[in-house]
Amino acid sequence: MSTDSDPLAAAGAAEVPLVGPVVCAALRIEARAVRRGLTRTPVVVVGYRARRAARLPGACAALVTVGFGGALDERLRPGDVLVADEIRGPGGTAAPCSAPRLLAEELIRDGLSAQVGPLVTTDRVVRGRERAVLAAQGARAVDMESALVAARAGGLPVAALRVVVDGPRHPLWHPGTIGRGLAARRVLARTGPALERWSVLLVRGEDGPAGA
């Protein structure tokens, strides 16, 4: 078994309650990056399109999905962090997120550029007209996993953050993507402390309403 999933292997099998959140990442590179800033929070690699989401434990305080994403809103630049206030999935489903503004404030405290808005999950990389359609519907960024993770939350609080790599003016299939990806990885590695402070406030009940 990969070391990326070891922290939860025993807890997930035995359903040992976890007092804090579980962080989910699609890719190992994302998991390794976010883990650098975490001191006590387990990270699970759920795979492309969350194909291994079944390994997520059912007994934890919250599910947090993190990683790289694409901007739909031109106001989001590469390296910015989009904190979802809702996660939109296929068929018009939408999962509200817990205390997104509080999480954004904690990220900003650490010197990161964070904004709040809807995140949409698609089943493929979107470009051109598809991006424009999603943006017109109010979504600010896109990924391929968060809604699938949220669907398994079973009533647990959910949060999602995506570090922007590409966008309307920064196409994914471009030589500059390599540099933007490396920069995004550095940003993702700095999100851990804010995530853990946010989770403490959430457990204490200081989160306020979902849109707060």
Label each residue range with its predicted role.
Residues S2, D6, V16-A212:
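Glycine-rich phosphate- or other oxyanion-binding loops that anchor nucleotides, phosphorylated ligands
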Residues G12-A13:
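Glycine-/acidic-rich phosphate or pyrophosphate-binding loops and their flanking alpha/beta elements
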